[in-house]
């Protein structure tokens, strides 16, 4: 089995259909995308004991305490830790991924993400906050990073004629994982309890991601799509005549400009995600029955996830025609205008306008994620794009805290 994980064992033959690779990437990204749905766990994790901690119990004491409940602010740190370790893992293991191949990285991601959720289950059983952070945060975060970058360079090499479409397909599932995971998690919590849910979902994701990883193939050296002539395509914006090595990419101003672009885009998107649902409930409170406003707000949250998914494939594939630079110019100009308009729509209780504004912002949030790998390939070449993309994702780590 271990031999079948090696990169030289997954080189595709001439009869292989390149469209078999995107579904494999989708299985992995739909699994790790559940990190966006972790909000369903916070209420359950704050009432495991049934007794509130007194004001004299410090933050550090709550990390190990078993006699009273954690605060919501304690457990939500799990998400921030996971995003930080996503960026760190992507940066540290990106170069290893290029050598080891996507299948080995995908299996490692499955073990870390699935195993991390199982460790979290243990933390719930023992009521140890540090185990929650270690499981879903640190171990799971490493799985997120490995899983996130595992298909990127592979799909770019399979689709050199449509790099934007390729990265959109690779990253699309991450935005939609919560749409599947949240209803499943909610059902399992009601049926089994939150601790058991973490274990069951960890096992499900471990199996699903492993199956996805075994669907990965890499093209043979020199392969290109039938009928595609790279010489005829005058879109070469590379800063060098050859592929830029990962150890040199971060020494260029282009890398840091793209790093800043990603950080700003993600910070803005997280800023909207963090307030959109409660803000919607506030502005819509006078227009809907209080008994159904919660359900409507949940539906609004699902719409945001859908916009995130659509934006990843729409903007990334559109960038193949618009150009990467123009696409990001649209993100910044239109995004800034809409970001400033959202509070205005909320204050004046323009519900439909507020919903439309936030949905468009979320499409650009997802599109920014999905288009950046293709932009990197345009500038630095495809040979080390996975490793370079991994290092660029440290911007996500910072944005996860700032946003």
Predicted segment positions?
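C-terminal ends and interior cores of transmembrane alpha-helices
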Residues: 111-125, 333-347
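A late C-terminal transmembrane helix in Major Facilitator Superfamily
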Residues: 169, 178, 365-366, 377-403
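Hydrophobic core of transmembrane alpha-helices in multi-pass small-molecule transporters
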Residues: 30, 116, 129-146, 263, ...
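Intracellular juxtamembrane helix-capping segments at the cytosolic ends
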Residues: 45, 144-159, 166-167, 366-380
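Extracellular/periplasmic helix-loop-helix junction of adjacent transmembrane segments
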Residues: 41-88, 289-299
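Helix-loop-helix hairpin linking two adjacent transmembrane segments in secondary transporters
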Residues: 174-223
